[in-house]
């Protein structure tokens, strides 16, 4: 994958330096793909770490419960949340120690900026649908004196598999317009179809989707490119309903090693 804004690489280097200033890390992950959206390449193992599964309202409920148990069995602290959850509920779940100095991280479009703004109690930073929109690194404080460090989203410089790229596409962490490899679209559709029980082939599904949405070229030919753009944008936004794109039992030891912090 060639898409990798320079500010994300810069932030990754800075985060390694800033880890010495904090004692707690909150990893914001998309509940629809908790493994794929943990792809940092930064080792947080020496810090108290909270895995925050965001967007649980658009993830499959049973699968989310499996992920919570999966992380708990690994001895990790995990909480769940969503955009509509009140600030006081989120703060209670996080239950930071008064002396906490917190680093909040997340790959693009996991909802990290929304979490940050909710904790601030006001919409103080730019929140948008484009991955990597928050470019600065800054501190802010909660009412009880807890200090929180905001960071941009982080992605691997090298997305090492079609499977990972496909899942990041499905949750919106990779911009759909930057995908140049048809195989990634095909793999993403395969994952989506398996998740909700679609039996149509890739070509059948998108030809039908294009016709239903009026995405046609001259002569009534389905515009597959526009169909792909619209479909994957809507899936990332949660318009396909409550669906998860990976399960704990599908993650192999090799995959876990590939995404281990460095």
Swiss-Prot record:
UniProt xrefs under PROSITE patterns: G_CP
Single GO MF annotation: GTP binding
Keywords annotated in UniProt: Cytoplasm, GTP-binding, Nucleotide-binding
GO annotation (BP), single: translation
Keyword Coiled coil: no
Domain CP-type G: 12-157
Binding site for GTP: 54-57, 109-114, 153
Gene3D superfamilies: 1.10.1580.10, P-loop containing nucleotide triphosphate hydrolases
Record's keyword annotation contains Isomerase: no
GO cellular component: cytoplasm
Location in the cell: Cytoplasm
Domain of life of the native organism: Bacteria
Family: Belongs to the TRAFAC class YlqF/YawG GTPase family. MTG1 subfamily.
Record-linked NCBIfam families: GTPase_YlqF
Free-text function comment from the UniProt entry: Required for a late step of 50S ribosomal subunit assembly. Has GTPase activity. Binds to the 23S rRNA.
The protein's name in its UniProt record: Ribosome biogenesis GTPase A
Protein's organism: Thermotoga maritima (strain ATCC 43589 / DSM 3109 / JCM 10099 / NBRC 100826 / MSB8)
Gene (name only): rbgA
């Amino acid at each position: 994958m060639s898409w990798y804004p320079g500010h994300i690489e810069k932030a990754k280097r800075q985060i390694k330096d800033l880890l010495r200033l904090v004692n707690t890390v909150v990893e914001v992950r998309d509940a629809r793909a908790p493994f794929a959206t943990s792809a940092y390449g930064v080792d947080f193992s020496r810090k108290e770490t909270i895995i925050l599964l965001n967007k649980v309202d658009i993830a499959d409920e049973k699968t989310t419960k499996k992920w919570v148990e999966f992380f708990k069995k690994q001895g990790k602290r995990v909480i769940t949340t969503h955009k509509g959850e009140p600030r006081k509920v989120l703060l209670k779940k996080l239950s930071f120690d008064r002396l906490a100095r917190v680093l909040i991280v997340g790959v693009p479009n996991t909802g990290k900026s929304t979490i940050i703004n909710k904790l601030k109690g006001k919409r103080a930073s730019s929140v948008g649908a484009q991955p990597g929109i928050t470019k600065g690194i800054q501190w802010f404080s909660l009412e009880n004196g807890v200090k929180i460090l905001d960071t941009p989203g982080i992605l691997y410089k090298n997305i090492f598999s079609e499977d990972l790229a496909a899942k990041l596409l499905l949750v919106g962490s990779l911009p759909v317009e930057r995908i140049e490899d048809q195989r990634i679209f095909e793999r993403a559709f395969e994952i989506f179809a398996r998740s909700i029980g679609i039996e149509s082939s890739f070509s059948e599904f998108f030809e039908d989707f294009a016709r239903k949405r009026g995405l046609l070229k001259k002569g009534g030919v389905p515009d597959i490119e526009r169909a792909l753009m619209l479909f994957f944008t809507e899936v990332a936004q949660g318009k396909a309903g409550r669906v998860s794109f990976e399960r704990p039992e599908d993650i192999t030891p090799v995959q876990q090693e590939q995404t281990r912090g460095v």
